[in-house]
Amino acid sequence: MVGGIMSSLLADEVEAATGIKPFVGLLNTPGDIDPDNDFIIDELPLDYSILEEIDYVYPANNAYFAYMTRGCVNNCKFCAVPKLEPKYCDYINLKQRIEHTDKRFGARKDLLLLDNNVLASKCYNQIIDEIRDCGFGIGATYSPPNEYEIMIDNLRDSYNDRAYIRKAISIYKEIIKKLKDEDEKTELYLKLEEAHCLYYYTASKKDILALDEYIRPLYDKTHKPSKRKRIVDFNQGIDSRLITEANMDKLAEVNIYPLRIAFDHWNLRDTYEKSIRIAVKSGIKNLSNYLLYNFEDKPEELYFRLRLNVDLCEELGASIYSFPMKYHPINDKEFFMNRDYIGKHWNRKFIRAIQAVLNSTKGKIGRGIEFFEEAFGRDVGEFMKILWMPETFIIYRRIYDANLRARLANRYTTVTKHDCDLTSEWWEKFKALTSEKLEKAKSIIALNKFKDGDYLCEDKEINDVLAYYKITRDDTESN
């Protein structure tokens, strides 16, 4: 059987490629797969043991994953939720799933909720009360469970032996690392070697259980867990249009961190700003949002949204982290197999410029006007200049921009032999082009292809400008 997000959005394409007719949508009614089974699969507890089957450690590996609602009351053109979860569900029980998880896998520190529009629920107050009662009220803390005991219990129950054999080896390595007595380390290593339990691919359940009496005291000796703050994260964000003082005061009863408020387009600015002020007034000062771009927005509107967040941080004493997120049509046959979509107000050069800036900010923009203005410009004019700027000049701003070095001299104290002012040189030539030549230059720059043969231009002034775009990262780093 094939199902899930891709199969629901691209059902015809999946069937054509595989010959399998996919299941579209949620498994949220009894008998979806087995007519004689009354279980609602979508509401069953998750199997967290699969996280132990691989070497990669997920950043949110110590969180409960859940939905308390499904669907969304909106029908935004850019969003896949109406197709994935077409019917809004006001409430899904959380408490029973957490109790099952705690018993089988041990308690998790955080609660990561994937609801698409929780504020639309008629059961909103009940949902927040349940989250609080499950141990996530304001000020709630978490004491890590005994991972060794969980591992042994699950092996004895024959629950996912593959996962818990790997977990056992991981725990053994931790114990060796934490033991301070070299003789104890050596003795443990030799015992593990003798039992073939140094590596998961040679270890067996039988040998791990046989070592229990010896290993357990060492685990207890080396593991002294301390309490840690718990957090709740409505990871998909909440709808700014539905925020009120009442529902923010209610949300402030749990350890929400961060509060993610959608800011999908500039037309929402008044509603969005009001929602931020209400949240901060309710005591919620750690906020975040995704900023959709490359849809129907103009580039300058992305700057306005980013700037508004930075200004609100300064005024309200809040922390708002913004994550620009490029729109891509996932169910358009022309684009779902590539990343080539360009919005009607955008071009390939602008997209690359945003990505280059975000690489330097690690994909997010937080508080701090000086850092923001260095990355995105002091005003929308500087922002547009950065979008047209050669990519290497964006990435190595300190090397190529003398004006920036002078303006931020308190931070840029190191002088290198490579420092120059090619940015000003490029900009003067760029601005000096006649309107007709500038349009021609922009039409070439917009395609973001500058190798020999990528474009045809015989105008010397335009070619002088385009020469700066041929300077590569390798050129900079090799010099």
Language model regions located:
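Canonical Radical SAM [4Fe-4S] cluster-binding loop centered on the CxxxCxxC motif
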Residues: 59-100, 105-107, 119
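Structural alpha-beta junctions
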Residues: 16-25, 132-144, 280-286, 310-320
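Glycine-rich beta-alpha loop elements in corrinoid/cobalamin-binding modules
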Residues: 1-63
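A structural motif corresponding to the C-terminal lobe/cap of the Radical SAM core domain
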Residues: 237, 249-417
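Conserved SAM/AdoMet-binding glycine-rich loop
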Residues: 101-288, 293
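C-terminal non-catalytic accessory extensions
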Residues: 416-479
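Short, solvent-exposed loop/turn segments at secondary-structure junctions
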Residues: 5-9, 27-31, 71-74, 82-86, ...
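Short, aromatic/basic amphipathic alpha-helical patches
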Residues: 11-19, 126-132, 308, 335-344
